[in-house]
Amino acid sequence: MKIGIIGAMEPEVAHLVESMENPSSTTIAGIEFVAGQLAGKDVVVTRSGIGKVTASIATTLLIEKYAPDAIINTGSAGGFADELAIGDIVISSEVRHHDVDVTAFGYEIGQMAQQPAAFIPDTALVTAAQKAVASLGEVKAIEGLICTGDSFICDPVRTKTMLEHFPTMAACEMEGAAIAQVCHQFDVPFVVIRSLSDNANNDSPVDFDEYLVKAGHHSALMVIALLEQL
């Protein structure tokens, strides 16, 4: 089994790459892909860059060049679930775009034309992630809706609007739904696993800078624990 692992920023993939055996690096279109072994599995780890376009490019290249059996998106996110604190983890139950609106043509808010309203992660990957939680000690993890858009959310007015549209949203970030959409197009199983770096409020920019490394490390540990369950 070969697993593709995608993170947007260096702190989100650094621990994974450092933990790999027999790493081999290839760069395509400015995106580095590191192949090797991690937790006894063949893996390819890539840092996609921030946002939906770069995430889509990286995912497509990963699938076309390496043909992974499944893809895990790891990294940080802003939290919306009251029971979660910075450093806690959200495992995707579904993934949606929060910044898409073609409702004029009868689609749901967040649904891209000719695409499903929500992208559903692979059941086996979600189950493996749930089992992996036990190995993380004090870190809390829940399963929930993760939403994606090309904006860093720290405006209370925008947060309120997003929660009106997606009242069950547990976390938001900037790559997951794009990765999920590409996986849907290629019929590749996926799961999104995010650790909270901030709480999507006025303090988010400060919290993000301070806690990104912590969130990235927690999410990476979760990915390694998940791989051990596969």
UniProtKB/Swiss-Prot annotation:
<feature type="binding site">
    <location>
        <position position="153"/>
    </location>
    <ligand>
        <name>substrate</name>
    </ligand>
</feature>
<dbReference type="InterPro" id="IPR010049">
    <property type="entry name" value="MTA_SAH_Nsdase"/>
</dbReference>
<dbReference type="InterPro" id="IPR035994">
    <property type="entry name" value="Nucleoside_phosphorylase_sf"/>
</dbReference>
<comment type="pathway">
    <text>Amino-acid biosynthesis; L-methionine biosynthesis via salvage pathway; S-methyl-5-thio-alpha-D-ribose 1-phosphate from S-methyl-5'-thioadenosine (hydrolase route): step 1/2.</text>
</comment>
<dbReference type="InterPro" id="IPR000845">
    <property type="entry name" value="Nucleoside_phosphorylase_d"/>
</dbReference>
<protein>
    <recommendedName>
        <fullName>5'-methylthioadenosine/S-adenosylhomocysteine nucleosidase</fullName>
        <ecNumber>3.2.2.9</ecNumber>
    </recommendedName>
</protein>
<dbReference type="Pfam" id="PF01048">
    <property type="entry name" value="PNP_UDP_1"/>
</dbReference>
<feature type="active site" description="Proton acceptor">
    <location>
        <position position="12"/>
    </location>
</feature>
<keyword id="KW-0378">Hydrolase</keyword>
<feature type="active site" description="Proton donor">
    <location>
        <position position="198"/>
    </location>
</feature>
<feature type="binding site">
    <location>
        <begin position="174"/>
        <end position="175"/>
    </location>
    <ligand>
        <name>substrate</name>
    </ligand>
</feature>
<dbReference type="GO" id="GO:0008930">
    <property type="term" value="F:methylthioadenosine nucleosidase activity"/>
</dbReference>
<dbReference type="GO" id="GO:0009164">
    <property type="term" value="P:nucleoside catabolic process"/>
</dbReference>
<dbReference type="GO" id="GO:0019509">
    <property type="term" value="P:L-methionine salvage from methylthioadenosine"/>
</dbReference>
<keyword id="KW-0028">Amino-acid biosynthesis</keyword>
<dbReference type="GO" id="GO:0019284">
    <property type="term" value="P:L-methionine salvage from S-adenosylmethionine"/>
</dbReference>
<dbReference type="GO" id="GO:0005829">
    <property type="term" value="C:cytosol"/>
</dbReference>
<keyword id="KW-0486">Methionine biosynthesis</keyword>
<dbReference type="GO" id="GO:0008782">
    <property type="term" value="F:adenosylhomocysteine nucleosidase activity"/>
</dbReference>
<comment type="similarity">
    <text>Belongs to the PNP/UDP phosphorylase family. MtnN subfamily.</text>
</comment>
<feature type="binding site">
    <location>
        <position position="78"/>
    </location>
    <ligand>
        <name>substrate</name>
    </ligand>
</feature>
<comment type="function">
    <text>Catalyzes the irreversible cleavage of the glycosidic bond in both 5'-methylthioadenosine (MTA) and S-adenosylhomocysteine (SAH/AdoHcy) to adenine and the corresponding thioribose, 5'-methylthioribose and S-ribosylhomocysteine, respectively. Also cleaves 5'-deoxyadenosine, a toxic by-product of radical S-adenosylmethionine (SAM) enzymes, into 5-deoxyribose and adenine.</text>
</comment>
